[in-house]
């Protein structure tokens, strides 16, 4: 359902928004575009609401349309499992008053609602879901602490501070007997100081020695930072590709003159964007990348999904990381399957879901004793020297 706000679509804009959609055995782009109002809900059908900017006016809208398409593909796959869904969608752009959408009688009938995208729309939607006993899944970055006080909220987004702490914990657990080597990349735009300073502080507290060197150091001084007896774990203080490229060249020179030296790298989520360029280097230097998602283009399941997306919507997914259609698919499968199996008792905690995500794992913990649930899924993507990739979940 597209809300009656001041927002107006421009001539030529294309939307694929059902109002509402009842999943069917056959599913294509035309079914979305021309969907008619759903029939009376079956007793076992879950009512799902989407309140996001679903338009073709700007990047936010295009990304959310892609998320929504993946969501609908999940509903179609669930149909084959005997799980019926009635999906209702409201276009809620940045300047919309979400309270207008909430006047629609279909909103209060939902079992769960996914949204909003914008922080200022969160409180009225959260209050509405609390009043009507509806699960509210907030799928993207939102400011504020509504989740601390509202037990109906499921916050998927994790703050930079939280992820930084988890990356440090993972490093300390994975490399207790290694020699960390911090490389200053002379990048004045870097925002990685929170991680490198935090990690150094933790290493100091544990009495673990480490070295600091610089990309501009001579080969001799650069080599002095590395251990010949322990595995070295290299940490750059930037996530940018140009500096990574220089660092890899320096490591190539180092290992050419010290062939027995053992080296691993601990990177940043941004490195996942560079795999087409640096994949062989990631294998060579045993790279670990902390992340909350992993888009595996080589996976058969991912390839099948992309082919289906291309067939149904006559276009490819955007090249953003994470892929928004895959995110929507994983979110829908996780929550709808969980709600179908466990009803109101489904909280998304460890062990409550058997769903294996294509890209975006979810695992929730209580945000506070009286609050909602906060996503805690985290992993290391490990590029092994055997040219295999493993994901290590925490």
Model-assigned labels for residue ranges:
Residues 1-394:
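Extracytosolic ligand-binding ectodomains
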């Amino acid at each position: 359902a597209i809300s009656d706000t001041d927002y107006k679509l421009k001539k030529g804009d294309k939307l694929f928004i059902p109002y509402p959609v009842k999943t069917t055995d056959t599913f294509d782009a035309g079914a979305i575009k021309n969907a008619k109002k759903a029939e009376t809900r079956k007793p076992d059908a879950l009512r799902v609401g989407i309140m996001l900017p679903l338009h073709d006016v700007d990047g936010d809208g295009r990304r959310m349309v892609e998320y929504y398409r993946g969501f609908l593909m999940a509903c179609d796959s669930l149909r084959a499992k005997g799980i019926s869904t009635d999906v209702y969608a409201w276009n809620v752009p940045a300047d919309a008053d979400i309270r207008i959408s909430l006047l629609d009688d279909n909103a209060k009938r939902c079992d769960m609602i996914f949204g909003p995208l914008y922080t200022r729309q969160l409180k009225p939607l959260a209050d509405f879901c609390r009043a009507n006993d509806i699960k509210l899944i907030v799928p993207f970055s939102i400011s504020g602490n509504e989740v601390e006080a509202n037990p109906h909220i499921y916050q998927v987004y994790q703050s930079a501070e939280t992820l930084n702490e988890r990356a440090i914990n993972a490093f300390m657990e994975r490399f207790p007997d290694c020699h960390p080597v911090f490389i200053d990349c002379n990048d004045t735009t870097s925002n990685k100081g929170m991680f490198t300073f935090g990690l150094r502080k933790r290493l100091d507290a544990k009495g673990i020695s480490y070295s600091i060197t610089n990309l501009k150091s001579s080969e001799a001084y650069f080599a002095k930072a590395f251990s010949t007896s322990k595995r070295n774990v290299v940490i750059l203080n930037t996530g940018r590709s140009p500096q990574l490229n220089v660092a890899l060249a320096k490591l190539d020179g180092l290992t050419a003159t010290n062939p027995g030296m053992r080296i691993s790298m601990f990177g940043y989520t941004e490195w996942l964007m560079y795999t087409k360029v640096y994949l062989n280097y990631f294998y060579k230097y045993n790279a670990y990348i902390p992340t909350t998602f992993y888009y595996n283009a080589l996976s058969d399941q991912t390839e099948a999904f992309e082919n289906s997306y291309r067939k149904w919507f006559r276009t490819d997914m955007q090249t953003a990381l994470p892929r928004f259609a895959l995110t929507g698919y994983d979110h829908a499968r996780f929550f709808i399957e969980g709600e179908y199996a466990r009803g109101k008792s489904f909280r998304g905690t460890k062990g409550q879901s058997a769903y294996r995500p294509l890209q975006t794992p979810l695992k929730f913990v209580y945000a506070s004793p009286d609050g909602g649930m906060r996503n805690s899924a985290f992993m290391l993507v490990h590029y092994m020297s055997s040219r295999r990739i493993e994901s290590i979940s925490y």
